[in-house]
Amino acid sequence: EEQKADILSRIKATDSSDDLEGCDLVIEAVFEDSGLKAKVTQEAEPKLVANGIFASNTSTIPITQLAGASANAENFIGLHFFSPVDKMQLVEIIVGEKTSDETLARSFDYVQQIGKIPVVVNDSRGFFTSRVFGTFVNEGICMLGEGIHPASIENAGVLAGMPVGPLAISDEVSMTLMQHIRD
């Protein structure tokens, strides 16, 4: 419990790039909007240490596209944490066209150090796992529309090996974000 408190005390959410001075790694997790992500990239990158990594938590926007806003595309990578983060073990590592092997290796090590399972994928819209989870969630919503009880849908998802059911995932991600991604 003490170790947990110590670690949590070192994590700081911020809306000021000044708080990022000297960071080795920044993981951007703003809304799925290329313009907003570009703004955050350009404000945060100058604060990183030399060779610092800037990662986007995007779930759908191609990393190569997002890296276009970066002054150091070789240090730009995708680290997509799945919701709910405390239950989902996978972290999708998305390599852009200019992402260096060193950035990939350091990112892979980071994901393992925090106790998650890294999955390296190539760059494409939706990557791999968002496509899989999209199907899982969409089918759960369709089943709900067909009149199947929500508890039965959730239970089936968990029995199939998922940490949570499709309706819980859609609630966690939000219908607004899912519609934005689809459109």
Protein language model regions, located:
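Conserved N-terminal Rossmann-fold NAD(P) cofactor-binding segment
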Residues: E1-D24, S34-G35, K39
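Beta-strand segments within the central parallel beta-sheet cores of soluble alpha/beta enzyme folds
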Residues: A5-R10, N75-G78, I153-V158
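Conserved structural-core and active-site-/substrate-pathway-adjacent residues in large, well-folded domains
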Residues: I11, V26-E28, A55, S83, ...
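Short loop/edge segments at beta-strand edges and connector loops
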Residues: D15, S56, N122
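Structural motif
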Residues: D24-L25, G52-F54, N75-F76, V91-E92, ...
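Rossmann-fold NAD(P)-binding glycine/threonine-rich loop
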Residues: D33-Y110
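Substrate-binding/catalytic subdomain of NAD(P)-dependent oxidoreductase enzymes
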Residues: I94, K98, R106-F108, P118-D183
